[in-house]
Amino acid sequence: MSRLALNRYSRCFSRLKTLTTPLFFSSSAASNRDGDYQIGPPPIRVGLTESAGRAVFATRKIGAGDLIHTAKPVVACPSLLKLDSVCYLCLKKLMGSAKFEDRGVSYCSQECQENSKGFLDVETRADWSSFDDYCRTHNFKYPLMVKRLCCMIISGARPADCLDILQPAVLSSEMISKIEDGYGLLWNAFRKANFKDDDVAFLTKQWYTAILARIRINAFRIDLVGGSCGEDLLSLAAASVEGEGAVGHAVYMLPSFYNHDCDPNAHIIWLHNADARLNTLRDVEEGEELRICYIDASMGYEARQTILSQGFGFLCNCLRCQSTD
């Protein structure tokens, strides 16, 4: 998900039907640019549109640059390339010797170490070498998130249906074939570790495929704005452009309801860890839909449409794309 954006247009939207489904997410109240927190819930609501499904709308006017809300991930997972340099739970970059180690992984704080104990107890019972090699060889990132979610479910930290409310991606037959390979490796790792049948009863091929389909279209790539002390800012920027700056990926509940626009009025950023911050890019009026850009908004029209079609399954019809800008 890109943080780059332009801001030009305001929009009018179709009639809404407010969602009554309870949402599984953690978010804070909004604050202004000076960081003063306001009393009450975030100034947004989730509704349904006739054309784009779920959407997020402002319940009052929100100023340019204001924090809309924050959100903690339902599941977050570090990149295999970053296992030695970021916190195993929150993905914060580790600062030299200031880290806490437990069974071969590192954390930024004792709090993260304690909060990870449940799923780490499950994870360390199994041998993941074949599964990790499979992900590393094919450069797969989302199966690693499923692995972590499975460990969280077995430990009781998450219910097996925690992502069911999210929209799934449409998977090709080729993708499904590759998914089956990953499922077999994941299932065998738990089976060989002698987990009870009741503990892994949820882990069917159907569940695995459905979870991957949801993670694939809803996962955010975590590019941290704040680096470790002493890191060269130019190097950080170059790594981000090349895609090497990502510390991992995460799935959120409320941020996943934001629709896309190539000229968004909001964006999502990560300052120091996987806790997401949604900010406005310009003034937003009461009742206006809040939209973010799923990709690099600096790309040309054809490139944007290709990536959105292949990666997210839709062609963008925002005002910017209508003008083929």
UniProtKB/Swiss-Prot annotation:
Record EC number: 2.1.1.-
Keywords: Chromatin regulator, Methyltransferase, Nucleus, S-adenosyl-L-methionine, Signal, Transferase
A single GO cellular-component term on record: nucleus
SET domain ranges (all copies): 42-295
One BP annotation, GO: methylation
An annotated Gene Ontology molecular function: histone methyltransferase activity
Intrachain disulfide bonds: none
Catalysed conversion reaction: L-lysyl-[histone] + S-adenosyl-L-methionine = N(6)-methyl-L-lysyl-[histone] + S-adenosyl-L-homocysteine + H(+)
Subcellular location: Nucleus
Enzyme class label: transferase
Signal peptide: 1-30
Major localization class: nucleus
A Pfam family reported for this protein in Swiss-Prot or TrEMBL: SET
Keyword Cytoplasm belongs to the record: no
Top-rank taxon: Eukaryota
Entry's transmembrane regions: none
Family membership noted in the UniProt record: Belongs to the class V-like SAM-binding methyltransferase superfamily. Histone-lysine methyltransferase family. TRX/MLL subfamily.
Function: Histone methyltransferase.
PANTHER family documented for this protein: HISTONE-LYSINE N-METHYLTRANSFERASE ATXR4 (PTHR12197:SF298), HISTONE-LYSINE N-METHYLTRANSFERASE SMYD (PTHR12197)
The protein's name: Histone-lysine N-methyltransferase ATXR4
Organism for this UniProt entry: Arabidopsis thaliana
